Amino acid sequence: MSIRLPDPVTLSSGLVAEFEEDRWVPGSLVLSVDGTPQSHINLRSPDELFFEYIRRIGHVIDLFRAPGEPISALHLGGGAFTLPRYIEATRPGSRQQIIELESALVALVREAAPLPKRAGIRVRHGDARDVLGRLPAGMQGAMDLVVVDIFAGSQTPAHVSSSEFYGLIAPLLAPDGVVVVNATDGTGQAFTRGQAATLRERFPEVAVIGEPQVLKGRRFGNVVLVASAGDPELDWLPRLLACGPHPARMLVGRELREWIGTAAPVRDESAMPSPLPPRELFDV
């Protein structure tokens, strides 16, 4: 039986957002913006994640605290609220906030796939960087997890990739809080190496995980960056790699420094948006 879906909406950027049924996973929806798949949600089982990079982030969420323990989480970029739904399903009682620029997108998501009524999830509208600068004082030092997954269409905007931007995130983290960043990149991995250099400037421990061919710059894809606010060990990282999806490679310590190479931390004046994906990447 097909799912009744709302009509596509035009966002303030002029891009079109729409939901489609996933023909391979019954009861699931895919949110696309400007033809680029942005989010996948399983309406029947929100604790099941589909996209590879989302599964990697899901494993971070599973491992960085005791199983089932409620957390405080801030999501920069809403998409279809896939990860907030996952946290609500796997860590009930968690307190979560989402910052999303596009109010029309939020309305579309709420219509197509409403959040659980009792979920402790609040949505704030606005540009992530602007809203970060005026969050309540009570959120300072209180976030166990901050997820950065910000895209305008298929690119991460430049102003949410700089050291100044991450400088607004750092004070929000609890002493052992974690930041997780989703980045997309291709040949040379210049954007992602710059993100890693920027995070290393702000946080004591950073790890990068992705498919080996993507990390080598031979293929366009997602790379997940993990940064710790205070735990220099991150002793759960080996388990993160083992969780998959596979193949996967993790870069930490000396390997990460060598991979970053000459890439410098990104400043506002040098920031660039992430590269566009190849046109054929999402062809079916």
Language-model-detected regions and their locations in the chain:
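Short strand-connecting beta-turns/loops that link adjacent beta-strands
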Residues: 24-26, 175
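C-terminal substrate-binding/active-site "lid" region of AdoMet-derived donor-dependent transferases
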Residues: 164-234
